Curated annotation (Swiss-Prot):
Domain called Thioredoxin: residue spans: 35-140
UniProt keyword Plastid present: yes
Name listed for the protein in its UniProt record: Thioredoxin M-type, chloroplastic
Matches recorded under InterPro entries: Thioredoxin (IPR005746), Thioredoxin-like_sf (IPR036249), Thioredoxin_CS (IPR017937), Thioredoxin_domain (IPR013766)
Length: 140
């Protein structure tokens, strides 16, 4: 019978404390930081309906999980389209009159307004691509 010697499991000099994927070069991407503004029952007409550019309105509530999921997406869109599109958020708990006027029954609901008129409605937490595709139809 031949005996086979085993090597002790000792880390080699080449290994490091960090896994290989962590040693890779960092990804660089440009992120435009912006936040959607806030509107309420008192400011909605002036900010949204009288806007010279299209407006994306995010109807939300602080207790709504899906609303919190899409909030950063709306903020990203606000940054990416800041010169072409106005993005605002309306808290339906604090501004029930506007929410009622536009028949908001489910949140999150996103509406796109252009020229003071409602053009499009998106209900639910949808992917960013869906929101962008909808918004781009109304940009000049």
């Amino acid at each position: 019978m031949a005996l086979v010697a085993r090597r002790a499991a000792v880390p080699s000099a080449r290994s490091s404390a960090r896994p290989a994927f962590a040693r890779a070069a960092p990804r660089r991407s440009v992120v435009v930081r912006a936040e959607a503004g806030a509107v309420n029952d008192d400011t909605f007409k002036n900010v949204v309906l009288e806007s010279s550019v299209p407006v994306l309105v995010d109807f939300w509530a602080p207790w709504c999980g899906p609303c919190r999921i899409i909030a950063p997406v709306v903020d990203e869109i606000a940054g990416e389209y800041k010169d072409k599109l106005k993005c605002v958020k309306l808290n339906t708990d604090e501004s029930p009159n506007v929410a009622s006027e536009y028949g908001i029954r489910s949140i999150p609901t996103i509406m796109v307004f252009k020229g003071g008129k409602k053009c499009e409605t998106i209900i639910g937490a949808v992917p960013k691509a869906t929101i962008v595709q909808t918004v781009e139809k109304y940009l000049n």
